[in-house]
From Swiss-Prot:
This is A-type ATP synthase subunit B. GO terms for cellular component: plasma membrane. Keywords: ATP synthesis, Cell membrane, Hydrogen ion transport, Ion transport, Membrane, Transport. Its main location: membrane. It is a peripheral membrane protein. It is found in: Cell membrane.
Amino acid sequence: MTKEYKTITEISGPLVFVEKTEPVGYGELVEIRTASGEVKRGQVLDTSDEIVVVQVFEGTGGLSKDSSVRFTGDVIKMPLSPSIIGRVLSGSGRPRDGGPPIVPEVEREIIGAAINPASREKPRAFIQTGISTIDGTNTLVRGQKLPIFSGAGLPHNDVALQIARQAKVLGEAEEFAVVFCAMGITNEEAQHFMADFERTGALERAVIFLNLADDPAVERLLTPKLGLTTAEYLAFDLDMHVLVIYTDMTNYCESLRQMGAAREEVPGRRGYPGYMYTDLATNYERAGIIKGKKGSITQFPILTMPGDDITHPIPDLSGYITEGQLIVSRELHRKGIYPPIDIRPSLSRLMNSGIGAGHTREDHRAVSDQLYAYYAEGCDLRGLAAIVGKEALSERDKLILEFADQFERRFVNQGRDEDRSIIETLTIGWELLSMLPETMLTRIDDKFIKKYHPKYAGTAKKE
């Protein structure tokens, strides 16, 4: 029989301090009953011989020292069944779509563990997102964790939605699902997400967790863990390939800082807790493929860099854990280019595992390298032209400058509903490279030039 205690000594922000009257486990689920009879849920955050610290998910409004506390002896679990696909849930896992509660086939603890490195399968399968700057130059591979580093006011949410509805594995009929975790978003953003999912039919293969800006901040710490627990069930129990998209991890980290301040912890860099790196890793490292299992988890975390500062602790620490990054550029956005992904500072560390013959096409790496090289040189020449004038540039430099402009207009820029195949992306790449003399294509093997260059493509097909 569980006991209820009226031993609250202090209420501070989202935290309740309770005098310890029985052995209590870390992470244990707590129920707190207010004077009006309302029951609020919480979790044991810290425990010692004298005091138990409880974080309350629904906020501490209405609580007093007379409120009763009950320790359940259990941890937070996520109810799971195949019918969860297509559902919209709150940041704490409760139905938000007006539907019935989930009738679970299994219940899983939400505090999962990273996949054992010895049990991991190397990510190899190419995921086509339909976005050229990702598929062509920063390829996403199944089982990878590839974040988007963005800034306030940039269209990263539109990019996330486009990936959610277009992502697919080529040549495979295996089931594909999306787990979408939104943290600290506004009501307007939530309506935008839901309208897009319903308009495109993507909701039929998605599970959505919505934590709004006016929801308790502590709930934000649960949202990605609930989403990942759901993804693990879909991937490793139901053999599905799951893409997990979080937006915005910056709001998640702000909640961590808020909790640390409420507990009066010694802060780390810029006031964030010293364990933020470890906490982020417990989320990111739940991506991957397990040997002997058919399913996989691929992660697409999205975070807004405060002040567009890539050295800020949140993007800085995320970059150490994840396998690359996609950078959303304010400069490209000002030019009206969508998606404004700047390929120069972007990187996919697992790209080589998922491209080439048998995955995309044999010329993929060479075309990508050549596009990178001349686009980067063209961007440098823009700075030079601004100083000395375009007329002072050599003919070669003018050609590369024009190439960079065309690259942004034709390769980077595409419609919000435009789903390009990898062949279309590579074809656009070759058309751009055909602007340059063949002697300048130094990073591409002659056999690829003879086979795929627009000048020879028709001849190659006839032969």
